[in-house]
Amino acid sequence: MRAIGMVLAGGSNPRMRELSNQRAVAAMPVAGSYRGIDFTLSNMSNSHIQKVAVLTQYNARSLNEHLNSSKWWDFGRKQGGLYIFTPTITAENSSWYRGTADSIYQNLGWLKRSHEPYVVIASGDAVYKMDYNKVLEYHIEKKADITVVCKDMPAGTDVSRFGVVKTDEDGRILDFEEKPVDDYDACTISCGIYVVRRRQLIELIEKCAQEERYDFVRDILIRYKHLKRIYAYRHDEYWNSISTAEAYYQTNMDFLNDDIRKYFFRTYPDVYSKVLDLPPAKYNPGADVRNSLVASGCIINGVVENSLLFKKVFVGNNCVIKNSIILNEVYIGDNTYIENCIVESRGTIRANSRYVGEDGIKIVVEKNERYVL
């Protein structure tokens, strides 16, 4: 392909509540066996982008561990590959990434050494499938300076975590409002995916750095919306961000829908992830599992309904789990009741416990001793 990829995966996110205390949002487990960043990296690979940089910063240990081998996404190649860039102290720079534009600026040498004419920039915290070639073709057809992938959202959508765009009949963006406070009827939002010519990106980023501007949306898209040809490419398939705890919960629950599972996992192209060699889930006598997604390595002795169990979860005798997400390596003691919850990974839920999210999603973080002698 004629483009390189950049995945923005470094920001902290307090809207994820306790879930972001241990990992970056891009490393959040999704759909039983995947991580948030797997969907963007798979899209890059399936679009034949052979050189991809992941820009990390906040709580990056789990994400770096997940990306320790590039072979899972077919980036293990002599030409190109997968690059992990964290902020480093140099003679010219002594700070962390101060924003999305600054994260690109601090890795500008990689952009300058590349020879591909275009750059695809995407966030690592969205779940979707996309052929970036189609976006690039649209970008060239419109003779755009920047193309923003957008999605039409129905009335009632919480747009406070998105950028809302307004376009003319030809698709050119006329206005861009980042994370508006006011409610909207049906509107068009930015998906945080951009296509731009590499040389122009270098020029824009260098200008931002000279003026001490650090944010890609505010200091490039909004600032130049009337000066540059910025176009919207509409994505009509499934797309959802996992940038809040509530959105993360709903996105995972969407995978209990058979049509969505078929779209992601039984329809070409595939979604790739790091593979752990674990045994299949074991259902002991007394297990009752209904409309749930259970990952490998789990042992089930109780009732699981409308829930997702990630890898190596143990469910004790007489347990009931409803409408919940249990992350990796959680031990749930006997006679426990869990409903409308997200249970943090590597936790131990003591026997006879009860956790219910009554006014919303409850996040359970229990690090009890697993074995008492």
Sequence positions of predicted segments:
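Left-handed beta-helix
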Residues: 1-4, 199, 207-373
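Unchanged
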Residues: 1-255, 364-365
